[in-house]
Amino acid sequence: MEPGFWHEKWQQQLIGFHQQDINPFLVKYWQTLALPADAKVFVPLCGKSLDMCFLAEQGHQVIGCELNELAVQQFFEENQLPMKKSAEGEHQHYHTEQVSLYQGDIFTLPQSITAKVSGFYDRAALIAWPESMRTQYAKQLAQLLPSGSVGLLVTLDYPQEALSGPPFAVSPTWVETHLSDDFEIQALACQDVLADNPRFVKKEVPWLNEAVYLLRRK
């Protein structure tokens, strides 16, 4: 996916991937990670996700990375969070006391920024990449995460031929095959969410499963 694709989506506000509510899997399973309240938590390709507010409410220091500037600005504006902005290398750094968002390319994000994170949360990042680029992203995520860090991965799976992504279909087999070198993987839950996604229903996609995994960086 070229950067221009995502910039155009945000500019036109064609952001069906943005959830209006906190992800139920996050609420149900986050405590499974048993992270201390003051843990630093990394959220890749964070957009303006309300899930970051949930993480901050747990006491965590949230570190996000997002390509699009408008998404970052809208996060702070819509949640009425006064923020400061500064340049940090190739990225723009928007931050409050608890939330630090780095606007720019995740593939050039310095490892020093995530060196002290102990948790991570990926709901919309892995599924944003077509299969041809997904492995590259997964390796970059692994490089950014310290050994021993734990997180939740949320995926969607459906017959890919039924609909062109994003979001792209990520099967349990793909997760096991491509992530097991860098992560210990535990499948926590999987449920059919087709009825909650009108776009998939309209395109007559026969099934749509949302799954959540606990990942631990080796």
UniProtKB/Swiss-Prot annotation:
Keywords: Cytoplasm, Methyltransferase, S-adenosyl-L-methionine, Transferase. HAMAP family: Thiopur_methtran. It is found in: Cytoplasm. The keyword Manganese does not apply. Its EC number is 2.1.1.67. It is an enzyme of class 2 (transferase). It comes from Shewanella sp. (strain MR-7). One of its GO terms (biological process) is response to metal ion. SUPFAM superfamilies: S-adenosyl-L-methionine-dependent methyltransferases. The gene is tpm. Gene3D superfamilies: Vaccinia Virus protein VP39. This is Thiopurine S-methyltransferase. One of its GO terms (cellular component) is cytoplasm. Belongs to the class I-like SAM-binding methyltransferase superfamily. TPMT family.
